[in-house]
Amino acid sequence: MKGCIFNIDAGYLEGLCRGFKCGILKQSDYLNLVQCETLEDLKLHLQGTDYGTFLANEPSPLSVSTIDDKLREKLVIEFQHLRNHSVEPLSTFLDFITYSYMIDNIILLITGTLHQRPISELIPKCHPLGSFEQMEAIHVAATPAELYNAVLVDTPLAPFFVDCISEQDLDEMNIEIIRNTLYKAYLEAFYDFCKQIGGTTADVMCEILAFEADRRAIIITINSFGTELSKDDRAKLYPRCGKLNPDGLAALARADDYEQVKAVAEYYAEYSALFEGAGNNVGDKTLEDKFFEHEVNLNVHAFLQQFHFGVFYSYLKLKEQECRNIVWISECVAQKHRAKIDNYIPIF
């Protein structure tokens, strides 16, 4: 019965999304791509996939940045098509997905402005899914309070910004604190919204968002070593909707080095496994790569269940990983640096 009700409003879009997912590159496609000698070869191989002629109008010689832009453009068109045909509560769910891109755009613009880069040069670098009308006014803000009052007060990010408002000048450290505070509030709000929807959507999305929250807490901790950020301030940046909450986060807040972070992870089976295989030696996978691999697994598993919104989130994340893979391979081909060309993260 629940499936019938779900299908009234969201069944067509879920089916469409699953159709899009069938076009994600397989391992056999990657084996062809890594054998390419030039970007023109790569373009030719991509024509035999669901990407088709997306590079057909691009003049030679192709650049990696052009490939990156066209990959993003194709993904944005697909996502916006889903958003334009959605109704509540799916439309709000899809809007929530775009808020993370809005946060990234704001941080990019503030950082660029801090380094005296013209706003006209920064706007094209912003992600289209996170664009909003007030973006071009961001250069007038010198403090977080001004940023809120001049730019963010009328955007969906306003509720997330409440804990960031201060009269301190915007510098590198404050910008990072703002980024992480916004993400904390965003993840917690998205998690609560998914729980409110309930059912399979809550089961799938809360698992994915809990991992995202824990990943951010671990990375914030590791990146804070050797900086001026105090342990108390660091603890305030941890999202509280992950599996590490509360004991794991309390232990992370006390950590003084990487080994202590690893010791915290050992109490959580899925995170312990990620640290076990990670390293910075030649041939080792980085912790970041291990996190990406785990994220891919969670998002692939989202498609094993039906009648839920998680497939929309997971499709976007899997396609983003695919775009990173293609850009990585393109960079290696363009620079004739084939030693690390296999360091992409396979999806299927």
UniProtKB/Swiss-Prot annotation:
Record-given protein name: V-type proton ATPase subunit d
The organism's place on the tree of life at top rank: Eukaryota
GO CC aspect terms: proton-transporting V-type ATPase, V0 domain
Family note: Belongs to the V-ATPase V0D/AC39 subunit family.
Pfam families, sorted: vATP-synt_AC39 (PF01992)
Organism of this sequence: Manduca sexta
One GO molecular-function entry: proton-transporting ATPase activity, rotational mechanism
Keywords linked to the UniProt accession: Hydrogen ion transport, Ion transport, Transport
SUPFAM superfamilies in the cross-refs: V-type ATP synthase subunit C (SSF103486)
Subunit structure, interactors included: V-ATPase is a heteromultimeric enzyme made up of two complexes: the ATP-hydrolytic V1 complex and the proton translocation V0 complex. The V1 complex consists of three catalytic AB heterodimers that form a heterohexamer, three peripheral stalks each consisting of EG heterodimers, one central rotor including subunits D and F, and the regulatory subunits C and H. The proton translocation complex V0 consists of the proton transport subunit a, a ring of proteolipid subunits c9c'', rotary subunit d, subunits e and f, and the accessory subunits VhaAC45 and ATP6AP2.
Function: Subunit of the V0 complex of vacuolar(H+)-ATPase (V-ATPase), a multisubunit enzyme composed of a peripheral complex (V1) that hydrolyzes ATP and a membrane integral complex (V0) that translocates protons. V-ATPase is responsible for acidifying a variety of intracellular compartments in eukaryotic cells, thus providing most of the energy required for transport processes in the vacuolar system. May play a role in coupling of proton transport and ATP hydrolysis.
